[in-house]
């Protein structure tokens, strides 16, 4: 289908090109430092057609330390209830030490600062959220 292009690139350094009607990311941007997130949001804004949509399904940081701890406990309870073996949970926890999550509030502000409009969190369940904005 010539209406869809899939681009595999290093999001921290890639020229996103233009114009795109939609730019989507899932569970990736939380690996970037905050300044790189801000730069990426600006790059995405510049790569969208007028009215184009950016959607980011992401792992987020709790807005307070107490809520972050609650998110972590909930995630652990959920993966255990799903039957994920303990060794896989341990490996996931080790990988998560390298995550650089940011709060929903911070990311929405950075998206607005980058020039995106209609910025919103359209879904959130504990530490997982869908953030979006339009050019």
Predicted regions and their residues:
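A conserved beta-strand element that flanks and buttresses the S-adenosyl-L-methionine
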Residues: 24-25, 55
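A short glycine-rich, Lys/Arg-flanked "PGG" loop and its adjoining helix->strand segment in the class I
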Residues: 38-50
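C-terminal alpha-helical "lid/dimerization" subdomain adjacent to the S-adenosyl-L-methionine
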Residues: 57-114
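Conserved beta-strand signature within the Rossmann-like core of class I S-adenosyl-L-methionine
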Residues: 48-59
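A short acidic, Gly/Pro-enriched loop at the edge of an enzyme's catalytic core
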Residues: 12-23
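Core SAM-dependent methyltransferase catalytic element
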Residues: 108-135
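Hydrophobic beta-strand segment of the Class I
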Residues: 23-24, 111
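Conserved SAM-binding strand-loop segment of SAM-dependent methyltransferases
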Residues: 1-12
């Amino acid at each position: 289908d010539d209406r869809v292009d899939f681009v595999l690139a290093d999001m921290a350094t890639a020229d996103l090109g233009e114009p795109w009607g939609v730019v989507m990311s899932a569970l990736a941007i939380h690996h970037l430092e905050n300044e790189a997130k801000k730069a990426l949001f600006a790059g995405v804004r510049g790569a969208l057609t007028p009215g184009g949509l950016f959607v980011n399904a992401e792992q987020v940081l709790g807005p307070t330390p107490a809520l972050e701890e609650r998110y972590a406990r909930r995630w652990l309870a959920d993966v255990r209830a799903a039957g994920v073996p303990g060794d896989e949970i341990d490996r996931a926890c080790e990988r998560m030490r390298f995550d650089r999550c940011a709060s929903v509030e911070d990311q929405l502000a950075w998206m607005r600062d980058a020039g995106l409009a209609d910025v919103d969190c359209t879904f959130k369940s504990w530490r997982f959220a869908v953030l979006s904005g339009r050019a």
